[in-house]
Amino acid sequence: MQSLSVPDIIVGRLPLYLRALSHMISEGQEITSSQDLGERLGISSAQIRKDLSQFGEFGKQGTGYNISFLIDQLRKILHVDRIWDVVLVGAGDLGRAVANYRGFLERGFRIIGVYDNDPKKVGQPIGDFVIEEPSRMMEKIRQDRIEIAMLAVPSAAAQEAAENLVEAGVRAILCYAPTSLKVPKDVRVQYIDPVLHLQRMTYYVP
């Protein structure tokens, strides 16, 4: 079903499809079409069909897609048909917002610990957690074989934190710091920098 040769831009659209389909289910809809899905997302129906065809045939011409079935298939493709344990590094304002966000678990991700190297923060409550020191994080990652981390530290601390995560066994990092990390080729990094998105939008604003 899954091909490692699928372009990143296509993989990046799959979560958008999954989210839109989940909204359809919550509205009581059972069947959809590439045109319906495309209108919700601002993506052409041809592009949606092309994207999905990279992974198999999920619908029939004239009858559309069974939404529940397509959701199940997309979850398998994205490997979110299970719960992933995640560590959060950084307990500043951004880290606190991330720790308190309730939408992770319902979409396949469970934060299992929050860590910070500031002695004044260690031991303090944050969301449902108590902030722990980084040495405990390394132990936890190795012990529970955790593969995903979220990095919400200042730019100056991001590279060292990433190196520690990789050393402990993390294979994927979601980085909120406005910097570029140097990691091994087999470690996946995704960046979230709101300023970059704002700068992209202002290009289109006269």
PLM regions: where:
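Extreme N-terminal segment that seeds HTH/winged-HTH DNA-binding domains in transcriptional regulators
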Residues: 1-30
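Phosphate-bearing ligand-interacting subdomains
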Residues: 22-25, 129-206
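HTH-adjacent hinge/linker in prokaryotic transcriptional regulators
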Residues: 31, 35, 40-83
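Glycine-rich Rossmann-fold phosphate-binding loop(s) that bind the pyrophosphate
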Residues: 91
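Hydrophobic/small residue at the entry helix of a nucleotide-binding pocket
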Residues: 94
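NAD(P)-binding Rossmann-fold cofactor-contacting core
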Residues: 105-129
